[in-house]
Amino acid sequence: MENLSVDLLYMAAALMMGLAAIGAAIGIGILGGKFLEGAARQPDLIPLLRTQFFIVMGLVDAIPMIAVGLGLYVMFAVA
């Protein structure tokens, strides 16, 4: 029975890391599309849009890093 709970913790950590990566990939894809759409509509605002794009992209990319840290914590510290 002990082995089953450890296996479930490993599966939970894998799901946490995988779903966070998939969500971030979808978010960055949508963000890139909106950036290109905004740049095509108003080319004179490209420097402002680029700055905001990279700030938000960094925030979106930080979520999977946090999830990987939590997943590794669950795998090695809790289990």
UniProtKB/Swiss-Prot annotation:
GO terms for cellular component: plasma membrane; proton-transporting ATP synthase complex; proton-transporting two-sector ATPase complex, proton-transporting domain. Keywords: ATP synthesis, Cell inner membrane, Cell membrane, CF(0), Hydrogen ion transport, Ion transport, Lipid-binding, Membrane, Transmembrane, Transmembrane helix, Transport. The record marks 61 as: Reversibly protonated during proton transport. GO terms for molecular function: lipid binding; proton-transporting ATP synthase activity, rotational mechanism. It holds the Pfam family ATP-synt_C. It is a multi-pass membrane protein. InterPro entries: ATP_synth_csu_bac/chlpt, ATP_synth_F0_csu, ATP_synth_F0_csu_DDCD_BS, ATP_synth_F0_csu_sf, ATPase_proteolipid_c-like_dom, F/V-ATP_Csub_sf. The chain crosses the membrane at residues 11-31, 53-73. CDD domains: ATP-synt_Fo_c_ATPE. It is found in: Cell inner membrane. F(1)F(0) ATP synthase produces ATP from ADP in the presence of a proton or sodium gradient. F-type ATPases consist of two structural domains, F(1) containing the extramembraneous catalytic core and F(0) containing the membrane proton channel, linked together by a central stalk and a peripheral stalk. During catalysis, ATP synthesis in the catalytic domain of F(1) is coupled via a rotary mechanism of the central stalk subunits to proton translocation. Key component of the F(0) channel; it plays a direct role in translocation across the membrane. A homomeric c-ring of between 10-14 subunits forms the central stalk rotor element with the F(1) delta and epsilon subunits. Belongs to the ATPase C chain family. F-type ATPases have 2 components, F(1) - the catalytic core - and F(0) - the membrane proton channel. F(1) has five subunits: alpha(3), beta(3), gamma(1), delta(1), epsilon(1). F(0) has three main subunits: a(1), b(2) and c(10-14). The alpha and beta chains form an alternating ring which encloses part of the gamma chain. F(1) is attached to F(0) by a central stalk formed by the gamma and epsilon chains, while a peripheral stalk is formed by the delta and b chains. This is ATP synthase subunit c. The lineage of its organism: Bacteria, Pseudomonadati, Pseudomonadota, Gammaproteobacteria, Enterobacterales. The gene is atpE.
